[in-house]
C-alpha cells in the first residue's frame, strides 16, 4: 500500500532521491524508500533497544537522547545533500510515523514545510502481508498496525495532511 502510494506521488513529481531501497521478493516493483533514511531509523531504533517490528511506545525522553540528536544531524545532512535543489521531495519509511517529533526538528533545521499523507488500509490486509513476508503473528501485526496508525494520526494533527483510503488509491 505505502509503496504504491509513494510511487504514485513520485510519478506526480515528488522527488524521492537517488538512493532507493532495492526491490525484493514480495515487493518486486520496489519499496520507494530512501535507503539512507531507512538506515538512520534502524540505527536509532537499535540504540533505543528496539527493532522495526516492536509495538511498544518509544521511550518518553528519546528526543533528548544522544541517539536522537545523532539521527537529526544525520537526517539533516542526508536531506541537504540529496534534496537541496529540489522544490518538491518526499521520503517514505513505514517507521516514520514513530518519529514525527524527531522529523519536526529535521524540518525546522531545513526550513522545510512538511505535508503528511496517511494511507488507511484494512488492518487485516496489513497483518496478512506482514505474516507472508515476516511470519509475524496476527496479534503482533495488529498491535504494530495500531501503534503506527495512532502515532501517525496524533503526531500529524494540526499539520498539513491528507488521509487516503487504500481502496480509493487502487
Enumerate the language-model features and the residues they cover.
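PAPS-dependent sulfotransferase catalytic core
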Residues: 1-73
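PAPS-dependent sulfotransferase catalytic domain
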Residues: 50, 69-170
Amino acid at each position: 500500500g505505502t509503496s504504491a502510494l509513494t510511487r504514485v506521488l513520485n510519478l506526480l513529481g515528488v522527488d524521492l532521491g537517488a538512493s532507493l531501497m532495492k526491490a525484493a521478493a514480495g515487493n518486486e516493483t520496489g519499496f520507494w524508500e530512501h535507503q539512507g533514511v531507512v538506515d538512520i531509523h534502524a540505527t536509532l531504533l537499535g540504540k533505543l533497544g528496539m527493532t522495526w517490528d516492536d509495538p511498544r511506545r518509544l521511550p518518553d525522553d528519546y528526543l533528548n537522547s544522544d541517539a536522537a540528536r545523532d539521527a537529526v544531524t544525520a537526517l539533516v545532512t542526508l536531506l541537504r545533500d540529496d534534496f537541496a535543489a529540489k522544490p518538491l521531495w518526499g521520503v517514505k519509511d513505514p517507521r516514520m510515523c514513530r518519529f514525527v517529533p524527531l522529523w519536526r526538528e529535521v524540518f525546522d533545521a531545513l526550513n522545510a514545510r512538511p505535508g503528511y499523507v496517511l494511507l488507511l488500509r484494512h488492518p487485516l490486509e496489513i497483518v496478512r502481508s506482514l505474516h507472508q513476508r515476516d511470519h509475524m503473528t496476527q496479534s503482533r501485526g495488529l498491535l504494530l498496525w495500531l501503534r503506527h496508525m495512532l502515532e501517525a494520526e496524533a503526531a500529524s494533527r494540526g499539520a498539513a495532511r491528507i488521509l487516503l483510503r487504500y481502496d480509493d488509491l487502487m
